[in-house]
Amino acid sequence: MSSETLEFQAEARQLLQLMVHSIYSNKDVFLRELISNASDALDKLRLASLRDKDLDVDTADLHIAIEIDPDARTLTVRDNGIGMSRDEVVQVIGTIAKSGTAELLRTLRESADAETSQELIGQFGVGFYAAFMVADRVVLVTREAGATDGTRWESSGEGTYTIASATDAPQGTAVTLHLKPADSEDNLHDYATEWTVRQIVKRYSDFIAHPIRMAVEQPGTDGGESTTEVQTLNSMKALWARSRDEVEPAEYHEFYKHVSHDWADPLEVVHMRGEGTFEYEALLFLPTHAPLDLFSPQGRRGVQLYVKRVFIMDDCEALMPGYLRFVKGVVDAHDLSLNISRELLQQDRQIQVVRRRLVKKILATVKELKANQPEKYRTFWTEFGAVVKEGLIDDTENRDSLLEILSVASTHDPAEPTDLADYVTRMKDGQTDIYYATGENRSTIENSPHMEAFRAKGFEVLLLTDPVDEVWVERVGEYEGKTLRSVAKGQVDLDTEEERSAAEAERERQRTEYADLLTWLSSTLADQVREVRLSARLTTSPACVVGDAHDVTPTLEKMYRAMGHEVPQVKRILELNPTHPLVSGLRKAREQGVTEESLKETAELLYGMALLAEGGELADPSHFTRILAERLARTL
């Protein structure tokens, strides 16, 4: 196939420009990214040769070679791995199909802060594109294992690339960088020198499991001619196989960046070994930042599976539950078959045991952070709390551990979240329920009519603002014998026995006085509500809308419908504040024979205001605003 010039996909072109004009201070990491890609290609070739007996490839000497030419100012990273087809080159390099790309680019454009931009780029992981931080032109030559012809790709990072056939390409991939001039002010080192390359490999890629080789010129002895010697630059020691006291923090950090393609250091390291019936080593990391695709169904899981240091697969879902999908790292199991499939992994007894132990260790680590390193814990929960709470829904085995690390906002202290254990210690005498409220944000919840009685009586309420909160509180149900109870469901009675006795006569009078209005409103609003009653939870608002204890909330209804589920609409209950002038005025207007049409309009306004006050949505906003505008006009 002849040479052709193609344009980068729009988002790839924008990300490429960020690299060409990069503000990232540590440009040395381009080599780490290229070596990581080469290492992945070698792992994939070895795995393919094990699974496909018809694939005729030599895996006896899998390695990475680095070649430098100071005169031509080039640096080449070469591997004899799996290689790529022409279509793969276009797909992998010319296009970015990664979830979150558009969001990343939008945020980067809006950010004027260099440090924030660097963190965002690091969270996304740019891999191959990092080469353009240090190179004016990049040439890639590759041939897929088992194919006869290769592909040559070239670009100067200006929005287009050239792709052509390469009949003489060896198996694997070679990336040649035509380097920019060294510039100390821009943190551009001279990457065509042996010493610089050696230092970068030692710092970032020493643990890579394949040899990284480079031809090194050795001076001759006694004035003789110099010779060239091929040296291995890395130690190739699997970090997870070493004991924790043998590993420096910097080594952990660089290994994390290798497996995660993150550019920030991890928040916490979990290094463990399992012995006995099932032997394994695990090196896991809690990231500092949530990835952009954390809530994407296509988002990548973070744990790689090895068997006796042989790479088996990325994103091993069988090793980590969905609510810990952000955990990165490596698990090396000793007794699995090299040919095990993803499907069989789900049922494998050893994997199930390993998974159970990993989850318990991760949760224990977070609990330890919560107790001893509150700043780290706060960072963790801010980034990943909404995901971790998903585990409360289905992981009954670890539910108690999850509740121990749970952190939620509360009316007790606007600045500091609380946990359930601390809430219980602050409960009033005689209080048997843990009260909570759900909504889009703290402000909406605090200003909701449902909160009025709780605020007046001094009862603490948990403020839950994540969509998953609606689900887990229903599923969990109680904590230490205390029922989790929504302030927006069921009847509310916060009075003491003495207060209840003193107020009983007044309540009976109100029930008698408002009986006719309640009956009329129940009939008038029958299409919207199933009952109208007097409220014990309102102190300043005229009305609110509540549900029964086991009703599906409007937020959950909306969520289920967005997911494509058929959910019958639940009619809710309208509660009235008998001491509010609007409610008492409506009662008097009905007794005085005001026109039915005017009374109905007032009833609709009362119900609509109750919906809006809790952050709900009107079924017919234009009808509501028309009635409201007409009423306001009469007052002028």
Curated annotation (Swiss-Prot):
Organism: Salinispora tropica (strain ATCC BAA-916 / DSM 44818 / JCM 13857 / NBRC 105044 / CNB-440)
Gene Ontology CC terms, in alphabetical order: cytoplasm
Biological role: Molecular chaperone. Has ATPase activity.
One of the record's GO molecular function terms: unfolded protein binding
Region (A): 1-342
Annotated stretches, region: B: 343-558
Region (C): 559-636
Pfam families reported for this sequence: HATPase_c_3, HSP90
Keyword Chaperone: yes
Record-given protein name: Chaperone protein HtpG
HAMAP family listed in its UniProt record: HSP90 (MF_00505)
Quaternary structure and interacting proteins, as annotated: Homodimer.
CDD domains membership: HATPase_Hsp90-like (cd16927)
Gene3D superfamilies in alphabetical order: 3.30.230.80, 3.40.50.11260, Heat shock protein 90, C-terminal domain, Histidine kinase-like ATPase, C-terminal domain
Keyword annotations: ATP-binding, Chaperone, Cytoplasm, Nucleotide-binding, Stress response
Family in the record: Belongs to the heat shock protein 90 family.
